[in-house]
Amino acid sequence: MTGDFAFVDELVSGIRWDAKYATWDNFTGKPVDGYLANRIVGTKALCAALGRAQERAEDLGFGLLLWDGYRPQRAVDCFLRWSQQPEDGRTKARHYPNIGRAEMFDRGYVAARSGHSRGATVDLTLYHLTTGELAAMGGGHDLMDPISHHDARDVPRAEAANRRHLRSIMAACGFASYACEWWHYTLKEEPHPDTYFDFPIA
């Protein structure tokens, strides 16, 4: 691991994670290049901001669960290769029910150069401290559909409220939201705004 990067769980007490791209449970249907361990990595600045967000979430009865942080460029390249393969239907219903693979890039759900590769972006959700269950958000991680947008109008009231909780927590701790994905947040003051890293997560 390079320079000012760290495993988030080593710096943020109590945070939970499930690194989706290190598992078979993601839109490609298999572990992604560069994810050799089920851990979340980020810059130390990201970790500090997540620590503040975790404390704010706890005040509201929630905890944070991370799905992704730093993403090696080789993983993004893997996404691009996957998008060019024939459709096999294995993950389509769950992750991109109304578009084709190539459209993920056109519609802004996946990018050839990802902010994740700069080390200051996270995919995350809330869970209830009392039960440990994930908060309902009206759609899962990497559901590439308008229902995942922040301005989606068909999200049930309780789920929409949970999205607002997450957004307010993250905004208060220096993060910017992404219009197309309720789970995606980037630290406004990125340490490496123009650098895309490629070291593996191991």
UniProtKB/Swiss-Prot annotation:
Cofactor binding notes: Binds 1 zinc ion per subunit.
Source domain of life: Bacteria
Alphabetical list of InterPro entries matching this protein: A_A_dipeptidase (IPR000755), Hedgehog_sig/DD-Pept_Zn-bd_sf (IPR009045)
Annotated active site: 181 (proton donor/acceptor)
Pfam families: Peptidase_M15 (PF01427)
GO molecular function, one term: zinc ion binding
Entries under Gene3D superfamilies matching the protein: 3.30.1380.10
Cofactor(s) this protein requires: Zn(2+)
UniProt GO BP: cell wall organization; proteolysis; response to antibiotic
Protein keywords: Antibiotic resistance, Cell wall biogenesis/degradation, Dipeptidase, Hydrolase, Metal-binding, Metalloprotease, Protease, Zinc
Family: Belongs to the peptidase M15D family.
Described purpose of this protein according to its UniProt entry: Catalyzes hydrolysis of the D-alanyl-D-alanine dipeptide. May play a role in immunity or defense against glycopeptide antibiotics (perhaps at a moderate level) in the soil environment. Might confer vancomycin resistance to S.coelicolor.
Matching NCBIfam families: dipept_VanX
Protein name (record): D-alanyl-D-alanine dipeptidase
